[in-house]
Amino acid sequence: MSIETLLEAARFLEWQAQQQQRAREEQERLRLEREREREQEQKRASNLARLAHALPVEEPRIEAPPLPLSPPAPPPAPPPPLATPAPLTVIPIPVVTNSPQSLPPPPPLPPAAQPLPLAPRQPALVSTPGLSIKEPVTLPTRPQVPTPAPLLPDAKTTVAPTGSPKPLQPLPAPILTIAPHPGVQPQLAPQQPPPPTLGTLKLAPAEEAKSSEQKKRPGGIGTREVHNKLEKNRRAHLKECFETLKRNIPNVDDKKTSNLSVLRTALRYIQSLKRKEKEYEHEMERLAREKIATQQRLAELKHELSQWMDVLEIDRVLRQTGQPEDDQASTSTASEGEDNVDEEMEGDRAGLGPPKLNHRPQPELLKSALPTPSTAPAPLPTHPHPHPHPVALSPAHLPVQQQQPPQQKTPLPAPPPPPATPTQTLVPAPAHLVATAGGGSTVIAHTATTHASVIQTVNHVLQGPGGKHIAHIAPSAPSPAVQLAPATPPIGHITVHPATLNHVAHLGSQLPLYPQPVAVSQPVAVSHIAHTLSHQQVNGTAGLGPPATVMAKPAVGAQVVHHPQLVGQTVLNPVTMVTMPSFPVSTLKLA
């Protein structure tokens, strides 16, 4: 039971005890009042009997008119009980009024003896002082009646009307003595049952409390079950939380662990993580400060470098720093005894400036800023030639068109052109370097004239997939051949021309260039082959030797173009530049 129910029960018991005590007091007071009323009625009856025998009948008729004036007196009667001296004179008036009011009913009894009942009217007024003297005994009881309980004023009020409205019942004096008793008794009868009603009222709340307790008990049982379920769920949730915490904490024994130990280890682990976080923050701050200092130092060094170092030296330093990468990117040469050519190339490079090409990292060819494969071809600045006459074309600038019909599989020999072919345009001294417009790769082959059949080939192809080209070059052979076997993508342009690199090599006429058939094989098609040999004659003659053979073998057809061999005095590093689109793997073989 809760505290509220206990308090309610205690209050109910106290209230029940008080009600019982009040009921007892009321019963005692009612009993005393009934006894006093009986005594008063007996006294009144005896007084009336005495007055009836002593007074005549006519006098009360004369005094009858003033009697109606007396009824206004009863209304002030209720308040006077509070003051003891005033009611002594006022209260007897109702007694007088009772007697005259009780007289009107006597007319039905005139034959018996009217003077007897009418006589008391006058003596009532006469005997009022006597009554007032006798009734002080009852007056002290009346003021006590209204004060103790609320039921007493009810009884008194009922008694007062018995004197005023119910005087009809007591006709003669003896009847008056008898009538008040039944009038008082019926009042007592209903007054006595109220205590049992109080008891019933007392019992009713007790039953209601019991019923409410009984109603609360099943509700309490339900709430207890709900509470148990909630407690079970809470414990399960806590257990799950501890399990997850245990899994997240390292170095925790699974067997002997309590919740307290898990919490302690978790606290230690969290503290260690916080310490590590602070250390990492300090480390990051230190690194940031070092980075700022390093950047400032770098800026200072750059400023100092720009003050005491000119542009040429900076370019040279950059070229030296970039040289290892160029050496690694370039392929090895298969020629023998080419040190002098390398020295000449390095001298030319130093004279013309640093190389600045991304797609063609050969230092020998980077004399000027060449465009990337996606740009248009740009002319190479060459050494001006003293002779105004045009360059003799050893092989004419013959384009080889692609043959679409597959039926033409036999090589079609072309007549050897004269030293100067009028049908083809002459290539001027500044030769043009042809680059593919499709972003293709480039194969550059240098031909050195130190030996008749020694060719220095630098094969460096920059392409998307990242494949490499293999360059195989064999020294002197009677008929060396350059064989290009790329993958499926077609070759854009093949241009063979000697580049004038500000260097003139004086060679003897006894060094002929042997006939060199060049075979270019490709599975798809050869779009354009331009084989140009432009030569500048200086103090010598150019003789035409046996013709070399250029064989183009596409998948759908073939053409054979013969060109005479060039034998002259001044041949400067003929450059074979093969420009082709990107393809995965190809082989450049010179055998």
Curated annotation (Swiss-Prot):
Residues 63-84, 102-120, 374-383, 412-421 have a biased composition (Pro residues). GO terms for cellular component: nucleoplasm; nucleus. Residues 336-346 have a biased composition (Acidic residues). Signal peptide: none annotated. It is found in: Nucleus. The keyword Ribosomal protein does not apply. It holds the Pfam family HLH. The modification N-acetylserine is found at residue 2. Residues 222-273 form the bHLH domain. Residues 273-301 are annotated as: Leucine-zipper. Efficient DNA binding requires dimerization with another bHLH protein. Binds DNA as a homodimer or a heterodimer with MAX. This is Max-binding protein MNT. It comes from Mus musculus.
